[in-house]
Structures are given as C-alpha cells and as structure tokens.
C-alpha cells in the first residue's frame, strides 16, 4: 500500500514538473502572435507598395532577401515590444481572465527569462533592419521604445487616451516595410502610416467595450471604463469617418497619374460598411455583441484594404 502511495506521489511530482516546463507555445503566446500577424500584413503591404512604385525595382534574389529580412526584422522588433509589454503588465494581467494564464503571469517563465527573450528578439530584429538601411532600424527602435516604455509603463496606466498614444508606435509596420525598400520617406509612406494610425483606436476600443469589466478590475483607465460605452462609440465613429476619405487619397500619393476606379469603389464599400456598423452601435441593446462584430470587421477591413492597395499599386507598376 505504501509503495502504491509513493508511486502515485512520484507520478504527480513528475506531472507537475512536466506541466511547468516552458514550451515553444509559451514563447509564441508571449509574443502575442495575433498582433504580430496584423503588423506583418501591414509591413508586407508597405514593402510591396514601395517595391511596385519604386523607380529602381528589386529583382530576383535581391528582392527575396530584402523581403525576408524586412519581414523577419519587423516581426522580431514588434515581438520584442510585446514581450516587454507582457513583462511590465504581468501583475495587471493577473487580474484579467483572458490574460491570467500567460506564462508571464503564472510564473512558468521567470522575469529574467522574459527579459532575455525580449532582448534577443529586439537585438536580432534591429540588426536585420539595419542591414537594409539605418532609417528602417531607427523606425523599429523608436517604435519599440514608444510602445514598450512610454505606452506600456506610463500612458497605459495613467491616461484615458492610452489607445490614441499607442497608435503612434502601432502604425510603424507599414512605414518600416516601405522604408526597407526605399530608404527614405514619401507621401505614400506617410499616408500608409496615417491609415494604420486611424484604424487602431476603433479596433482596440471594440476590445475595450467587450472586456470593459476586466480592464476596470485591472485598474486600466481605458476610454470605455472612464467615459462609458456611448462616448467610446462616438469616438470610434469619428475615427472611422476620417479614415475612409483618407484611404481614398492612396492612388494620388503614388504620383503616377493613374486613378483606379476599382480601388475607389472597393475602399468606399469597405469603409461604408464599417461606418454603417458603427452607427448600429447607438441602436443596439447588446454592446458586447456589437463590439465583437466591430472587432471582427475591423480585421476584415484592415486585411482587405491593404490587399486592394497592393493590387492597385502593382497594376500601376505593370502599366507604367
């Protein structure tokens, strides 16, 4: 009987040790893959648009190497920022249902390991970007500092406008992708940055409305928590209403003189649907359900908009 109990105790100990072992999944989850994927889509969009509109285009192996380096470098720098974000937010995340299982919260990954992981990602990413040109590396470093330090450590904890402030570094990926090809700015690069900047607040405030009570419990002064859902809905609609006409400027920024009816129609339809959905928010009885719909559509809008911008710029590349 005693041997049986000892065997059971040993088995339980082995199970606990195995369950506490850090896995690849823990590292991936800590980097917030959802954010990295959306950032990578934007970065690739910027890269492709720059490639299609550049006077001297990359070809063959040079194109492939530049693209891979730019995408990996951008993803690594952004992942470094999200890992540092998880490190600084671990005590806050412990109070939220959707984040309390993260390895940074449970103690599965000790703080030193998290910082090492984030630092390695950041250094590797910046080195890749610097190998392309100093400007892209500088943009990556600036975005990291702004997001991981200014936004995460300071503004997120103290200001109702943290989402607005966080949009400055959050809009960097398409700019970085563009500059990876050109090595300098242009009206197109600034417009891509502006589009992603305006897209972010409605997207993240939709999450804020859905998870309002969790943010309240964690002490995060997010707009829905402090000002309420109605004010947040007004702000979301204002951003979307500005975003839609700004997206229509994209063909003009390329400076080719070619204006695509396809792009205008697609951008108007996508934007019109989002505006219509935002208006529905003032009539709904279920804010959480509405916010979920807004969140999902914001991702669809984002992906399709960048896709049609890439198609439009490539069509101009073919006819020039």
Curated annotation (Swiss-Prot):
What is the membrane topology here? Multi-pass membrane protein
Q: Which domain of life is it from?
A: Bacteria
What the protein does comes down to: Converts heme B (protoheme IX) to heme O by substitution of the vinyl group on carbon 2 of heme B porphyrin ring with a hydroxyethyl farnesyl side group.
Family annotation (InterPro entries): Protohaem_IX_farnesylTrfase (IPR006369), UbiA_prenyltransferase (IPR000537), UbiA_prenylTrfase_CS (IPR030470), UbiA_sf (IPR044878)
Main subcellular localisation: membrane
| Pathways involved | Porphyrin-containing compound metabolism; heme O biosynthesis; heme O from protoheme: step 1/1
Protein name in the entry: Protoheme IX farnesyltransferase 1
Q: What else is on record for this protein?
A: Carbon 2 of the heme B porphyrin ring is defined according to the Fischer nomenclature.
Q: Name one GO molecular function term.
A: protoheme IX farnesyltransferase activity
What CDD domains does UniProt report for this protein, alphabetically?
A: PT_UbiA_Cox10 (cd13957)
The processes (GO biological process) annotated in the record are: heme O biosynthetic process
Q: Which GO terms describe its cellular component?
A: plasma membrane
**Family in the record:** Belongs to the UbiA prenyltransferase family. Protoheme IX farnesyltransferase subfamily.
UniProt-listed PANTHER family: PROTOHEME IX FARNESYLTRANSFERASE, MITOCHONDRIAL
- Record-listed E.C. numbers: 2.5.1.141
UniProt keyword list:
Cell membrane, Heme biosynthesis, Membrane, Transferase, Transmembrane, Transmembrane helix
What Pfam families does its record include?
UbiA (PF01040)
Do the record's keywords include Cell membrane? yes
Question: Where are the membrane-spanning stretches?
Answer: 34-54, 58-78, 112-132, 135-155, 160-180, 189-209, 234-254, 255-275, 299-319
Tell me what reaction this enzyme catalyses: heme b + (2E,6E)-farnesyl diphosphate + H2O = Fe(II)-heme o + diphosphate
Protein's cellular compartments: Cell membrane
Oligomeric and partner information: Interacts with CtaA.
């Amino acid at each position: 009987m005693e041997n049986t109990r000892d065997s059971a105790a040993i088995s339980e100990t082995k199970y606990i040790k195995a369950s506490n072992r850090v896995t690849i999944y823990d590292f991936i989850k800590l980097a917030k893959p959802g954010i990295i994927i959306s950032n990578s889509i934007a970065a690739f969009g910027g890269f492709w648009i720059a490639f299609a509109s550049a006077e001297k285009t990359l070809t063959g192996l040079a194109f492939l190497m530049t693209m891979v380096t730019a995408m990996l470098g951008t993803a690594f720098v952004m992942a470094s920022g999200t890992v540092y974000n998880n490190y600084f937010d671990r005590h806050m995340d412990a109070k939220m249902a959707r984040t309390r299982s993260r390895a940074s919260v449970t103690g599965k990954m000790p703080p030193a390991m998290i910082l090492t992981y984030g630092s390695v990602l950041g250094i590797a990413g910046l080195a890749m970007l610097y190998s392309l040109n100093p400007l892209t590396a500088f943009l990556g470093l600036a975005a990291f500092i702004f997001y991981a330090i200014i936004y995460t450590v300071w503004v997120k904890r103290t200001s109702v406008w943290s989402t607005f402030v966080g949009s400055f570094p959050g809009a960097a990926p398409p700019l970085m992708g563009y500059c990876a090809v050109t090595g300098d700015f242009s009206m197109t690069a600034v417009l891509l940055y502006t589009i992603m900047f305006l897209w972010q607040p409605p997207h993240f405030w939709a999450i804020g409305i859905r998870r309002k009570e969790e943010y309240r419990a964690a002490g995060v002064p997010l707009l829905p928590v402090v000002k309420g859902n109605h004010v947040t809905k007004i702000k979301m609609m204002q951003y979307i209403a500005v975003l839609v006409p700004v997206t229509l400027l994209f063909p003009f920024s390329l400076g080719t003189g070619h204006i695509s009816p396809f792009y205008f129609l697609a951008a108007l339809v996508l934007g019109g649907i989002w505006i219509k959905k935002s208006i529905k928010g003032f009539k709904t009885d279920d804010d959480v359900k509405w916010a979920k719909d807004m969140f999902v559509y914001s991702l669809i809008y984002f992906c399709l908009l960048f896709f049609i911008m890439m198609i439009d710029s490539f069509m101009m590349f073919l006819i020039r």
